[in-house]
Amino acid sequence: MHDKILILDFGSQVTQLIARRVREAHVYCEIHPNDVSDDFVREFAPKGVILSGSHASTYEDHQLRAPQAVWDLGVPVLGICYGMQTMAVQLGGKVEWSDHREFGYAEVRAHGRTRLLDGIQDFATPEGHGMLKVWMSHGDKVGEMPPGFALMASTPSCPIAGMADEARGYYAVQFHPEVTHTVQGRKLLERFVLDIAGAKPDWIMRDHIEEAVARIREQVGDEEVILGLSGGVDSSVAAALIHRAIGDQLTCVFVDHGLLRLNEGKMVLDMFEGRLHAKVVHVDASEQFLGHLAGVADPEHKRKIIGREFVEVFQAEAKKLTNAKWLAQGTIYPDVIESGGAKTKKATTIKSHHNVGGLPETLGLKLLEPLRDLFKDEVRELGVALGLPAEMVYRHPFPGPGLGVRILGEVKRDYAELLRRADAIFIEELRGTLATEQDAAAGLCEPSQVGKSWYDLTSQAFAVFLPVKSVGVMGDGRTYDYVAALRAVQTTDFMTAHWAHLPYALLGRASNRIINEVRGINRVVYDVSGKPPATIEWE
């Protein structure tokens, strides 16, 4: 039996990143809502508890509290942001409004020598004080520490940015160690999980496969499962995992909705039928999808339509299976959190995902989502462990709605064809261009990345079709054609992302080829927006 860390979610958009950091330390953890019962906490028997942040205010909301059992267990507890504030209130301290709210980068000074922060710093002041570069996001602050606590960290505008009761193993920080912006955040969380809580680092992907296979078999029994293949990483890994568990009880349905990447259909069929020997049904539903999308410009409406049509196609195929009771999807954690679908239901909705929203209550199939609690990097690791080829596992993510969310506004077949070809050219240039020593010298990549393709050095890259026309000149004639935007980002978790600093020569070749080879596009632009404030996909 694995040691476990219990993460209590108060509704933060980045709670799942806490779980990701804990799992990176090879310790099993689960996220549960903050209002679980005392009996649940005791039966879970965690080695330690982490209290997440929240968009709520501890000062205003007296309902979002940790169960009393958390404080009765006698195990270490780490409070993060709101978690620090509720720890303070529940143990006898005070929280107050902050005159100087902190959102973004901050430098925190460590105080004393606590087990949590001892030896962890980014730099030291001339006076010898250890300093941490962190990410803050709070409007309230702890004004008075509970009895037994000592000051652990501070900033000029937040005098109590960290506190500790070492005797009981209670620690709290006002900043967010789970996000990549906090440089030493991973070390801090590992220190709490491994050293303070004493959890054994024995949870590995091989164990997850065995546990997931057992769960799938127990859930499904002898019933049949239908799964929609999009050609993306998530649905492919989900299919391989379910096929490992139940074999021919799984039927994969590959739906051509007219919004696929270039040669997508052939690649998927060759992979799953030819290499994995899975049952695959190929359905050409492009007329159905494009017909329902005609005249629809709102991105949320488009996503709902695509999700609805997927359900209809799956239901039609399921009726052909005598024992089909389950609809499987490649839903992963970022899909769930961006849809406001965290277990607490408190997170704010950013945009709906067709995997999570759009499924009507009248759906005649039960839902199977074996990847729902995994992050993208964990999904890739799982795919490798399952024996999937690298060209599939490390392919860039592709949204379930396909090119439908990469064509701004109304979706038309002609638009999809232009975008398909432009996207293929961009990806071809990324795959064919290797990072050079000059790129490293210019700061575009690390020296250790020289020789790798720019496709491998970016986390996601694609073209976007803009339904606006611009004037151009080709040969001796005037053109008035559409605009394509290129998007490439680098990220570790897909919750935050930086735009990729690609070499100008690469962008120039991609632009020239698209304009010359894709008749109908005469201008190419590059997206230099990060996430946040922008999302990775344009819609």
UniProtKB/Swiss-Prot annotation:
Residues 4-202 form the Glutamine amidotransferase type-1 domain. Residues 203-395 form the GMPS ATP-PPase domain. InterPro entries: Class_I_gatase-like (IPR029062), GATASE (IPR017926), GMP_synth_C (IPR001674), GMP_synth_GATase (IPR004739), GMP_synthase (IPR022955), GMPS_ATP_PPase_dom (IPR025777), NAD/GMP_synthase (IPR022310), Rossmann-like_a/b/a_fold (IPR014729). Pathway: Purine metabolism; GMP biosynthesis; GMP from XMP (L-Gln route): step 1/1. The keyword Cell division does not apply. It catalyses: XMP + L-glutamine + ATP + H2O = GMP + L-glutamate + AMP + diphosphate + 2 H(+). One of its GO terms (cellular component) is cytosol. The active site is at 81 (nucleophile), 176, 178. Transmembrane segments: none annotated. It is an enzyme of class 6 (ligase). Catalyzes the synthesis of GMP from XMP. This is GMP synthase [glutamine-hydrolyzing]. It comes from Burkholderia mallei (strain ATCC 23344). The lineage of its organism: Bacteria, Pseudomonadati, Pseudomonadota, Betaproteobacteria, Burkholderiales.
